[in-house]
Amino acid sequence: MRIGEIVEKLGLEHVCGDLNVEVEHGFTCDLLSEVLGKAQPSTLWITVQSHVNIVAVATVVGIKGIILCNGHEYERETIDKARENGIVLLKSSENSFMVSGKVYELGLR
C-alpha cells in the first residue's frame, strides 16, 4: 500500500518523504533494540520516539516510514536525517494503540 493512501485514510500529518513509497507491514514498538530485531523491511513503524536514532534504526531494518503518535514533535535533526535517508515521517495526535488498529484495518500486518 502507498504511504500516501494511508495518510489520506487516517488523516495523518506528512512531515517529509515520498508519499508514493509502498509499505507491506506495520510494526508498533518504542524500544529500538526490539525494532532492530523484530521489524521487517518495507514496514510502517508506529512509535512515540522522535529522536534521530529512529532514522538509523529505520535505515538498518529497511523501514520505509514512521508514524509519531500522541501529538509529539520530531526533533529537527531527525527530520534532516530522514530526508537524507529517504525515510517518510508522519504524525498523529492519536495514541499508538489507536493508530495501530487503524493501520491493521487497512491490511498491513
Where in this protein do the model-derived segments appear?
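Short, structural beta-strand-to-alpha-helix junction motif
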Residues: R2-I3, N95
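Feature captures the catalytic cores and cofactor-binding loops of soluble hydro-lyases/lyases
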Residues: V23, L32-L44, V48-R109
